[in-house]
Amino acid sequence: MATDPRWVKIVEKNIEEILVDHAYCEQKAASNAISMIVQYPQYPDLVAAMSAICKEEMEHFEMVHQKLQERGLQLGFERKDPYVNDLSLYLKHGKTNSTPAGVFVNKMLFAAMIEARSCERFKILSEQINDADLREFYRCLMESEARHYTTFLGFARKYGQGIDVDKAWKEFLAFEAELMESYGKKETMHG
């Protein structure tokens, strides 16, 4: 489900909030990549990919932090992300299975979904936000986020032995589309 374009108007009323929330999204994405390395060291290609994603996400964090500083704003404290919590709850209620492969697939689909939604939000911001600097900033970020979500899906397919990953992804997408009906009303990256 596409984000309602009116979300950008909400964001424009509080640029500080979207930038702070975005910075922490990047930090959490980097932390998630590190967790994947620690949990799945038996997959050298995944370790290499997660290491690269971690570096890139921290570069994005630094870029967002720089945008805050340029505007005389501070990072502030981390915000809770109800969207991420809702996705996590869906997966915890056994939407694939509890085998090691099922847990792995869930983690990959979870990361892919967050990256895909972030990419979609970056696209909207790159097309519609009035601030030309932020428009270009989000256009650049959108391209890397698209690569990230496909990376996670690729690993789910490669190492999710015995699981119909495409079916699980379609079901997760359907859930997320319903979930998004209650989002898009706050000046946060997923809100």
Can you say where each PLM-predicted feature lies in the sequence?
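Non-heme di-metal
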Residues: 1-191
